[in-house]
Amino acid sequence: MKILNFFYENHPKFEISYERKVQIPLCNIIIKGPKFSGKKTLIFNYLSQFKPNEILFLNLHDTRFENQSLEHLSNFLEKNAQIKFLCIYNVEFALNLQDIKIPIIISTDKKDLHIEGFQELELDYFDFEEFVSISRKNLPINNLVGLFLQSGRSKLGEKNILLRQNFNTLELEILKYLALNLGQQISISKLFLELKKRLKTSKDSVYHTIKELENTYIIHPISHDEKKLQKIYFRDFGLRNNLCIQKDFAHLFENLILNELFKFKQEFFYNKFFTFYSKVSKIAYISSSTLDIDLIKLRAKKILSKSLELGIFHVVFITLSSEDSFFEQGVKFEVLPFDKFSLGF
């Protein structure tokens, strides 16, 4: 119990920082999300309403912590009845917490971690609306869009050194390949052959690593709506420019749009007509960063029959600055600059 007592007495400062759009409910909960998504900030904001001696905060990634001490957790809490809240941070495996009688918050970056009796809350990186709110810069909206594109949604997209600190060699090589092929259809076999030129690995290792990068919210695959094909994007579009020097604004902008669509909590698909579309909401999105209105209207006519075939009656072209709206055979075609698209949800 010495370790538990050490962390109880040497707790972090539970101070209020910036507010997120999501809030922690009053129940046992697992907060899931990628590294550097703000899970700790969200938790500290919530815990700031309690006195420090009422909280036991355990960071399982702290090198001084021993997992065996969790076996004594129930007894420790019984002997310290003043503790009213338990937080276990950076959990990577299922815990047996059935004997714990006080509210519990768990944080993890594992999508597949589930614990019986716990609700789950996914915390994504900042979207553009939160970026504008937190940056507090009195700048024109176009300038803020530019800053967002430069910085990305997290520290991983902003600070190169964090990549080597948080990913092994195979993970980094996979991420570099995905960055260079962003927005392209990805073949795992082709990826494996490329990686074999640079390091010793196996196809199983590559496949497992890709699955783990998805499970830890680093990458996000999008499936073709009819064929067994997929594209792989980043949960933080900013990762792309931190992994390679080649410029590819068109696909970076695609990734940015997908990141904003995450807030809908829907599955999206792609085909040669639509960058992304939802079979649930029946809305399609087309990344058109630099197309002018006349070219967009020409493209709208070319995809009209496919829209009607799929029952899609709302198509949104997302641009950097153009704006318009028109109808073709009952289908609404909307042209929106990125800021209005993002802030209009």
Located regions from the model:
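Accessory nucleic acid-recognition modules appended to NTPase machines
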Residues: 161-282
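N-terminal pre-Walker A segment at the start of P-loop NTPase domains
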Residues: 1-25
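Post-Walker A helix-loop "phosphate-sensing" segment adjacent to the P-loop in P-loop NTPases
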Residues: 48-56, 266
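Conserved P-loop NTPase "ATPase switch" module shared by AAA+ and STAND
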Residues: 73-96
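Short glycine-rich substrate-engagement loop in P-loop NTPases that contacts/grips substrate
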Residues: 53-81
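A cross-kingdom feature that marks ATP-driven nucleic-acid transaction machinery
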Residues: 2-3, 32-36, 41, 224, ...
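Interdomain motor-coupling "hinge/lid" segment immediately C-terminal to the ATP-binding subdomain
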Residues: 102-185, 189, 197
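Hydrophobic positions on the alpha1 helix immediately C-terminal to the Walker A/P-loop
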Residues: 42-46
